[in-house]
Amino acid sequence: IFTEYELREHQEQYASRIVKTGNLTLSIKGSYGIKPGDKPFKYMVANYMAVDVYKQYEYEQMELKSAGPNYAQNGRSGWGFGKILSRFGTNHEVNYLTFDFYDSMNDILNLRSNTFKFTKSQLAIWKSQDKLRELKNSHIMTLIASER
């Protein structure tokens, strides 16, 4: 889809912004609202999760049974979930990633700017989820270019 010239120009333009490079190998555990061959979403939030090695099965089941199927309730257009395979050990706290996909930056910012008052049952659900994982970081990303 992109010419060699376009790819080279794009890479040169953004190369100066790179602070650190690396790679992650993920096992995709689940996704909702995403189909192979679909055009990629323009906006994504990557959530970096630390999960105790002894609670990984329970954590995966929680994500697959509650977070994934309910992705649209929080304004998300899609959701994904993966386990990091290429890094392991006590020096690597983050061992899972979740991906929230959005149609607009405004959707992300509105969700983040709202302060929710939880009901007792909602609070109990969130606290039970927090016993299984700890959100270490969250990054908003914008799709710059894609090729299918």
Task: Go through each PLM region and give its residues.
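Short S/T/G/P-rich N-terminal loop/turn motif that feeds into the first structured element of a domain
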Residues: 1-148
